[in-house]
């Protein structure tokens, strides 16, 4: 009788160049267990020829390299990787090591929470000049805490197959507590309009009950 193959506790997917209009250089880690965790990841970047780039520093915009982002049971955590140092523009592959895992008591989301850029009419926008606020949605039957960051990207690359890299990140000072099945809007100061191109978020150990 053939033994049933057990799935790995975590799956990792790295996408250097997105084909769906989303951010480049994204990492998705999926939790196949029944326990929510705070993973700490380590990264080794490589170029398109498979050569390691030892002078490149790799961090996650959502803090996955620091063990700050919550990976819920049965759910996924998406992080955007930022590369700095000599050869940063050459990264096309990343080897990921799970350095540490801290278990945490947190329910598994039924549906993913969302964060979007919005204009003055509270409609979703991809135009940084119309980026007046952040719309947040929690469709789940329990409260969550979200940590939100604004992302500024480098200029569009000259070659279509090259990734558009993260240039700078600003994480909002206060985390946002969202009640079950609720939404919220965070209005931004006028002087940041036009400076950022994307908004990202991750779940954080809950402060909301």
Where are these regions (language model features)?
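N-terminal "mature head" segments of proteins
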Residues: 1-25
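Asparagine-centered strand-capping/turn motif at beta-strand->loop junctions
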Residues: 28-35, 47, 134-142
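Hydrophobic beta-strand positions in extracellular immunoglobulin-like domains
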Residues: 29, 45, 83, 136, ...
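Short, hydrophobic/aromatic beta-strand segments
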Residues: 36-42, 54-57, 144-150, 159-162
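Intrinsically disordered, low-complexity Pro/Gly/Ser/Thr-rich segments with frequent PxxP/GP/PP motifs
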Residues: 51-89, 161-196
């Amino acid at each position: 009788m053939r033994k049933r193959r057990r799935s790995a506790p975590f799956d990792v997917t790295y996408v250097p160049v997105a084909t769906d209009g989303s951010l480049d250089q994204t990492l998705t880690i999926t939790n196949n267990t029944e326990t929510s965790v705070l993973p700490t990841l380590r990264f080794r970047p490589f170029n398109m020829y498979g050569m390691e780039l030892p002078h490149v520093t790799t961090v996650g915009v959502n803090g996955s390299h620091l063990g700050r982002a919550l990976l819920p049971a049965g759910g996924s955590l998406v992080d955007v990787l930022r590369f700095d140092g000599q050869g940063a523009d050459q990264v096309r592959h990343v080897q990921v090591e799970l350095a540490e895992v801290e278990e945490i008591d947190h329910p598994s989301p039924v549906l993913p929470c969302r964060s979007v850029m919005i204009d003055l009419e509270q409609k979703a926008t991809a135009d940084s000049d119309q980026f007046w606020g952040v719309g947040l949605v929690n469709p789940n039957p329990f409260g969550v805490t979200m940590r939100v960051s604004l992302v500024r990207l480098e200029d569009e690359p000259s070659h279509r197959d090259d990734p558009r890299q993260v240039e700078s990140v600003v994480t909002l000072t206060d985390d946002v507590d969202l009640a079950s099945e609720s939404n919220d809007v965070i209005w931004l100061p006028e002087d940041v309009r036009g400076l950022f191109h994307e908004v990202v978020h991750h779940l954080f150990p809950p402060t909301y009950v």
